[in-house]
Amino acid sequence: MGSLDKDNQDICPICLDPLKEAVSTDCRHLFCRMCLTQHMDKASVSGILSCPVCRKPCSEGVLGDNYICHTHQKRVRRFCEASGHLLCEECLQSPEHQSHTELSIENAISHYKERLNRRSRKLRKDLGNLQQLKAQEKKMLQALQVDCECHRLRTDLQNQDQTKEQLKALPWHWLDQEDLPEEVAKIFSFSEAVTQLSILVSGLERMAKDLDASTLKDASDLLDRSAPQKLEGLLSRVSPAGPKLS
């Protein structure tokens, strides 16, 4: 029986699915944060907020500090895309936000989660292309190393006053040793870009997975940010659309 009770504690009584962002009411019942938020939205029409299970009174504060407007001490209901702020009903009446576009918290989370996932898929494809370019540069470096050995052989022949016919027998397209550092630098640039892009993609995927009202502004800021300049140059070689994150 104890095991059954434990299993029930991991299920939201409203959606009957495993708890997501679990929050506890004043009476200690657990719900998905979004499920309880939607319940409170409906209950606020009547002005009576109560636990969906036992009907005991509960406050909006159980949703957490991030869901309460610190200016008016009321629950936030909308996300302003222009300012990146969470707004309560009183905030929405402010002239500051009259010309702004606001989304409901639920729609904003869904909207930004889709944008984050779409961008991470695009950048993961770019990451694969960068890794291919890095592999190509490595092959070129190996070829240059062989060429340098041949270059040294050519120099030895010159030092030994060999005939022009012997020199002409060697390919003249071989590069000098001074070209090697440039190729090594290219490989380091690609390695650095692959590392940066891997971290960026992982961050986008993690943010999309854990996105909630408290991180909507972070998601908006991240999507509006451009890649570092060095990364932009390398991404432009694999992505004609450009490296902006949004």
Curated annotation (Swiss-Prot):
It holds the Pfam family zf-C3HC4. A zinc finger (B box-type) spans 64-105. InterPro entries: TRIM/RBCC, Znf_B-box, Znf_C3HC4_RING-type, Znf_RING, Znf_RING/FYVE/PHD, Znf_RING_CS. One of its GO terms (molecular function) is zinc ion binding. Keywords: Coiled coil, Metal-binding, Transferase, Ubl conjugation pathway, Zinc, Zinc-finger. It catalyses: S-ubiquitinyl-[E2 ubiquitin-conjugating enzyme]-L-cysteine + [acceptor protein]-L-lysine = [E2 ubiquitin-conjugating enzyme]-L-cysteine + N(6)-ubiquitinyl-[acceptor protein]-L-lysine. GO terms for biological process: negative regulation of cell growth; negative regulation of protein catabolic process; negative regulation of protein localization to nucleus; protein neddylation. Disruption phenotype: TRIM40 deficiency greatly enhances antiviral immune responses and interferon-beta production and thus inhibits viral replication. GO terms for cellular component: IkappaB kinase complex. Zn(2+) binds at C69, H72, C91, H97. A zinc finger (RING-type) spans 12-55. Residues 105-170 form a coiled coil. Its EC number is 2.3.2.27. Belongs to the TRIM/RBCC family. Interacts with NEDD8. E3 ubiquitin-protein ligase that plays a role in the limitation of the innate immune response. Mediates inhibition of the RLR signaling pathway by ubiquitinating RIGI and IFIH1 receptors, leading to their proteasomal degradation. Also promotes the neddylation of IKBKG/NEMO, stabilizing NFKBIA, and thereby inhibiting of NF-kappa-B nuclear translocation and activation. This is E3 ubiquitin ligase TRIM40. The lineage of its organism: Eukaryota, Metazoa, Chordata, Craniata, Vertebrata. The gene is Trim40.
